């Protein structure tokens, strides 16, 4: 069993000690917005009520991670930009092996960074766990049917963000996605399956497009088959949005071949793509500072957003 799988098991095992059996809530001043007006489509049973777990024994960047699981009512939380508004927005998709959501490490931490750069952040709390409930290290490539509920949540959120563009002071042509690990896989899925409607329209928001204007999958999983080919459930084409990839070569959960195979497919399709590989960094580092050079990836991402015209060049 790989370390990330072990970590998930430890979170589950320690839940009786560290869990707060309450639904995760954002900090004061922010409100979760249900993304479905009623019950979500393809609703699956989960092992118990939604919970958030804090494990002080497992620190990442000197801080514990908050894990959310058993999500049946997906929500989005909007974080307005600080200072000058660039008009850009990013839907942030935390990872967690489709079993939990690393809601702070790969969620609120990211929103703090994005909003400090004048970018609206929309944090998606999508449905987990997927069936089967037990994460298995040999379950790659991730079957599209297993992530349909999560991908439905991503499609719906993209459309809702554009539907609220005027209200939230967002340019509807500058709406992107950023995700980590399993969330990185969802970034690749929404980047290549946006023309595939996965649920019946529920309101006028669903008349809009779910295609991201840019995509940032970080240490993504489930993209490479065992023989080194691209997961066929991620049909890259010339319509796939510009993409920014980051991964560590010593990623012990989702090997670097995940990014390499996706980069190759994007390049062959003439999709603008930028990839940064680092010798060290492991997996699930988020934005928390470390001594490794990979900790500087946010500055590279910000520069990339400028080069593709999503935000102004720094200092202008």
Outline where the language-model segments fall.
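N-terminal cap/lid segment of alpha/beta-hydrolase-fold proteins
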Residues: 21-85, 116
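Short beta-strand element of the alpha/beta-hydrolase
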Residues: 86-95
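Cap/lid segment of the alpha/beta-hydrolase catalytic domain
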Residues: 97-106, 123-149, 191-195, 199, ...
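Short amphipathic alpha-helix adjacent to the substrate-entry channel of hydrolases
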Residues: 104-122
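Primarily recognizes the serine-hydrolase "nucleophile elbow" in alpha/beta-hydrolase
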Residues: 149-238
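Short beta-strand/loop motif that positions the catalytic acidic residue
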Residues: 239, 245-247
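C-terminal catalytic histidine-bearing segment of alpha/beta-hydrolase fold enzymes
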Residues: 260-316
